[in-house]
Every structure is written in structure tokens, then in C-alpha cells.
Amino acid sequence: MADTPDLTQTPPTIYDVARMAGVSIASVSRVLNGRRNPREETRERVLQAVAELGFVPDGAARALSGRLKEVVGVVIRRVRWTTTSDGGFAEEDESLQFTDVLNRGIELAAQRRGFNLLVSSVDADDHDASRRLLALARKSDGLILHDRVLEPDQLDELARRVPIVTLANVATRTTTNVHSDNTSGMQALAVHLLADHGYRSIGYLAGLADSPDSLARRETLAAEAAVAGAVLMAGPEWQGNYYATGGARVIEQLLADGTTLPRAIACANDQTALGVMYALAQHGIDVPGDVAVAGFDDIPMARHLRPQLTTVRQPIQEIGTCAFDVLHSMIGGGAPAARDVLLPTRLVIRASCGCPTISPPRRLP
């Protein structure tokens, strides 16, 4: 990480001036460039912020302040790995259906506002991520980050350059986080599996090791398993990566090691569950007769699996729409109503958990 740029040394930007003065970027532009006659109160606030920050507008800054780029950068975290096992898993390069639906929500909201998207991806082990995001920030009016691609302190420093909305349940001092309610969603799923079905052992097949969402779901499941007196299997050998091949790889390795599988498996997301169900079928293990399986997300594919997948529905497209709307407000100089925007989840009961029929989504209390 020695080549990571030191964002703390970057000069103040027009975004900093607008944020400190509590006005829009356009208002800062009018004051600095003498366009129209801004209100005296606005002029004084802008000039005071300029003085306190030591902001010196150069040609590029004036160009930026005079006209927004009308571009938002969207950053996705990708996972790439290989394995030499006889199972034949290839290099990871799957498309997450969750990401596709989420990006559609961002895109629809952006189109309504006349904005375009710059979509970029970084690998999970990309040590140059901060430099790449810095370059993307220069081309954008704001950033939406799907996953945890920077450490919180780096994220705060980058947010001094452009407004940032995160979708990875990462709380910082200067960014706004839009995400779904992991706790209530996993609670509802755990109660259904452990209390309604009475399963006495349950595994949790995790997402990425540093994913706040995956960790939150695991903690909730662990708490509910303790209350129910059920055995939870969630050690390092249950570490996935949010992809179907990651879920299949874990099951293949557990079976190769002679591990007795739990009665139910809750997965960090639906694509992991897809891989789990595929691997179980390859070994003649019946779902849900031998092992019940559940996911989290309710991606389109969940209802087309056989058996159909019991899962927790996130309002995926709405998360994207909400994220852009919040970011657009921040780009205009407004302060977000909240630094943490929480959207509700629903338990969707289908057949993979052992229920005989499909039920409509059950709204959580």
C-alpha cells in the first residue's frame, strides 16, 4: 500500500466551500465568477468559507464550478480467484444479479435528472483502488460505492473532494449510507427456520470476509440460534464470496472433508444459495428433504430455481434509486436528511426451506 496517494494533502475543493457555506455549487460559482448578483448573505458565507479553507480556484475549478459534469461515478467491487481442485472451478468472473438490478435503479433515477453514469469495477485485492477512485472522482460530480473498496479514513478524505453515497453499510463521518435492514430480515428468516420448522442445526455461508452486510447477518443469525438452542456452523470453512461458485466450492470442500452438513443452511445472498443448491444436487443431497437452503436478496433467479428459493427480499432497485436521489441532493449543496438511510426487508417463503407451498412476501413488523 506504499503507493497509495495521501488524500489528506489534497487542497480544498469547490465542494468543500459549498459544504462549509451551506449553499449549492452553483451559488459558489456565481460568487467566485461574478455572475448575476447573489444575495449579500450568500456572498458573505461563500467568501468566509473560501478564506477559512484557503480555497484558490484555478481554471479547472472555475470550469467545474461554472457547470456540473452531470456525471455520477458508480464503483463495483469484483472478486476474482482460481482453484486447482478437481471440481473444476474456473476464475471468478460472474455477474451479480443483485448488482445489475441495483444499477438499474441508479440509472433510472439518473436519467430523470439528466445525469449519466460512469461505472467502474475494482478487484477485492486491488491495492491501487484509492488512486483509481481519485481519478474517477475528478470526472464525476459524485460517487456511489457498492461495496467497501476503501478504508473509512480514506473514504472520509475522498469525500472532501466529491459527495459520496455508500451501499455497503459502512458508516463514516462524511458519507451517507443507503442500505436495507439486515437485522430484521435475518431475524425473520432465522425464526422461520429454527422456530417454525424446528431445525436444530444451521450453517451460515458467508459473503466476503470484510463485508459489513455479511457480518451483520451472521451476528443476527448467531443470536437467534443461541435463543433457540440450535447449533450454528459458521467457522472459516464456511467463508464464501457472494458468488455461486463460492457457495458451491464451500459445499464441495465440506463434503470432501467428511463434514456432516447441518439441517439448514442460510446464505449471505441468493447467488451463494444457488451454488449451494447446485453442489448439493451434484451429490444427491435433497433440498429441502435433507438440507433446507435459504438466501438473502430475492434476485429474479430465486423464483426460477427448483425448488424455489426461500429468501429475504431487499428493495434492490429502490436502494439504487434512493442512493442517487440522496447523492443528487448532496451535489446541489444540500445536507442529507440522515447519514444512514435504512430500507425495509421482507421474508419471502418458498419451497427450499421445507414449506409445501409458495407464500406471498410477508411484511415485517
Predicted features along the sequence, with ranges:
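Acidic, Gly/Pro-rich loop/turn segments at junctions of secondary structure
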Residues: 144-154, 169-175
